[in-house]
From Swiss-Prot:
Chain residues that bind Mg(2+) 1: 92, 225
Cofactor entry: Mg(2+)
InterPro entries: Anthranilate_Pribosyl_Tfrase, Glycosyl_Trfase_fam3, Glycosyl_Trfase_fam3_N_dom, Glycosyl_Trfase_fam3_N_dom_sf, Nuc_phospho_transferase
Record-given protein name: Anthranilate phosphoribosyltransferase
A Pfam family per the record: Glycos_transf_3
Any one Gene Ontology BP term: L-tryptophan biosynthetic process
Record: residues binding 5-phospho-alpha-D-ribose 1-diphosphate: 80, 83-84, 88, 90-93, 108-116, 120
Cofactor note text: Binds 2 magnesium ions per monomer.
């Protein structure tokens, strides 16, 4: 199958959703050689991935995942694509604790760094979380604490062999887009940041096709986040429809910040910034985390609009609920109560 698909891609033809799924199944089953996989990924990238192709790939990723059980109808993910190269602190990870502190269950999917010096797994490990905890520990954390970390390499074993091919290629491929689309707990409510604005409507279309209940696909001022530095492009997905609009920090009741104010560093530095935000420190990092938490709270139905989401997030921080979620997640993953 992969050989026929490669020929079609080289002739600049799009693949149908079922064709893409068949190729992904072949890759997962070990039926394609490394050379074939590398050529396929490069040809797909050169042609340009479509909604149907990404959706077909994501369906296989979801079907092949080692699933995490969550006994909740509504829970959110704040996993983005990474790869924006802007080296901010871990905004979406910080936002996840604020969302949990506000009372919404979070199944945070993530990995180690893509282009930054600190991915979500890196910063959480620096904070004391066992990011490679066993499945039952992750499920217990989600149930008892209201937040758990779903470490991608542990939970997507079918595509482990592709990691080496991706490293050798050294360029972005469809796999850079698939992580946030394949939450191992099956989250249908999410905030998904993308590294380029062109992906906002495309991944919005993918989430709509895959049955997302309520999601925000965002790109703000070069960041795979909602920006407090300027304009954010949004595709809000509900009931199979994608509403596109743009917004600025003032629309959320937040002031504008310089990008230097939200700059990060290595995992230890980013851990300090995250902890400071959860401790109530004012400034750009707090506002950036609140903006992204607000979207997750709206997606989950906990807030009527983004301004209310910012207010609820701020209350969760200021009463200590967000920092308590971090402390309890560390304790549970380390074998405590």
């Amino acid at each position: 199958m992969i050989q026929q698909a490669l020929t079609r891609l080289l002739d600049r033809h799009d693949l149908a959703r079922a064709e893409m799924s068949a190729v992904m199944d072949e890759i997962a089953d070990g039926g394609a050689t490394p050379a074939q996989v590398g050529a396929f990924l490069a040809a797909l990238r050169l042609k340009g991935e479509t909604v149907e192709e990404i959706a077909g790939a994501a369906e296989v990723m979801r079907a092949r995942v080692d699933p995490i059980r969550v006994d909740r109808d509504v829970f959110v993910d704040t996993c983005g694509t990474g790869g924006d190269g802007r080296h901010t602190f871990n905004i979406s990870t910080t936002a996840a604790f604020i969302v949990a502190g506000a009372g919404v269950t979070v199944a945070k999917h993530g990995n180690r760094a893509v282009s930054s010096r600190s991915g979500s797994a890196d910063v959480l490990a620096a904070l004391g979380v066992d990011v490679d905890a066993a499945k039952d520990v992750v499920e217990r954390a989600i149930e008892e604490v209201g937040i758990g970390f779903l470490f991608a390499p542990r939970l997507h074993p079918a595509f482990k062999a592709v990691a080496g091919i991706r490293r050798e290629l050294g360029v972005r491929t469809v796999f850079n887009l698939l992580g946030p689309l394949a939450n191992p707990a099956g989250a249908r409510y999410q905030v998904l940041g993308v590294y380029e604005p062109r992906w906002v409507p495309i991944l919005g279309g993918v989430l709509a096709a895959l049955g997302a209940a309520h999601a925000f696909v965002v790109h703000g001022e070069g960041l795979d986040e909602i920006a407090v530095t300027g304009m954010t492009h949004v595709c809000e997905v509900r009931a199979g429809e994608c509403e596109r609009y743009a917004m600025v920090p003032e629309d959320l009741g937040l002031r504008r910040h310089e990008e230097a104010e939200i700059a990060g560093g290595d995992a230890d530095r980013n851990a300090r910034i995250l902890a400071d935000v959860l401790a109530g420190q004012q400034g750009g990092p707090r506002d950036a985390a609140l903006a992204n938490a607000a979207a997750a709270l709206v997606a989950a139905g906990a807030a009527a609009d983004l301004r209310e989401g910012v207010r609820l997030g701020a209350e969760a921080v200021d009463r200590g609920a967000a920092s308590d979620k971090l402390a309890r997640l560390v304790a549970v993953t380390r074998g405590g109560a």
